[in-house]
Amino acid sequence: MKLTACIITFNEADRIDACLRSLSFCDEIVVVDSHSTDATRQIAGSLNARVIERDWPGYRSQKQFAVESASNDWVLCLDADERVTRQLREEIEALRTRGFAEHAGWSVPRITDYFGQFLRHGNAYPDRLIRLFDRRRGGWTGEEIHENTRVTGSVGRLHGHLEHFSYRSLSDHHNRMARYADLMARALYARGKRCGLSKVLFNPAWRFFRGYVIRLGFLDGWRGMVFHLVEANYVRRKYLGLYILSKGLS
């Protein structure tokens, strides 16, 4: 059974090489690039990826376009800052020999590198995502931000990690989450959602407490604390933005 890897990119020259090399076992690699101004497309092309340039419509739409551009029905979707580990690769290759027959899709545990150390507790782990699936029975859905995959049928569980090297610096993490929060506030408002001050005040505190205390995020040391503080600030900014829109104050 043939397999296509699907990735979307924009200015990922410093990370796309490692991502694509971890996908060398795939029969095809499709990279959909949003007009990068660095060497992303050249690097991808040199590693035998099929590169498609396309204007940016949003995360969900771009990822679904990549899936639809694949030559094979079974697809493995990655972000440019992710890498397939050896264990995960071996699991996928074993599935291929059976034609992926057992399920419509497979979830993988994603583990995030945070300033040189993988986070193994709290809200960051295990971050299970359906990334290997039959595109005839599933695809990308949800908001243009915080998109996800859904399949019609059963979902199996793989155990090898998908490594995530997302944040280049603390400011990068903070700025990215601030941007996501603003986008989500507008998306929620467009869907008719409204909120009061209680969510602005209490939801961030609960998110931090749940991740850092209940889910043992403190075991990741200072990295766990910083990660969950940034996450709590994301929740605060999201609901504050929705509150401002709800009151017509923007």
Give short role names for the model-derived ranges:
Residues 7-25:
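Short, well-formed alpha-helical segments that are part of the catalytic scaffolds
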Residues 2-4:
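Cell-envelope/extracellular polymer assembly enzymes that use nucleotide-activated donors
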Residues 28, 50, 154-156:
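Conserved beta-strand segments of alpha/beta enzyme cores
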Residues 22, 33-43, 79:
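A conserved acidic beta->alpha catalytic loop
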Residues 17, 38-47, 87-88:
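Acidic helix N-cap motif at the loop->helix transition within catalytic regions
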Residues 41-69:
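Conserved donor nucleotide-binding strand/loop of the catalytic core
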Residues 64-67, 73-74, 78, 85-250:
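Catalytic-site signature of metal-activated, phosphate-bearing donor transferases
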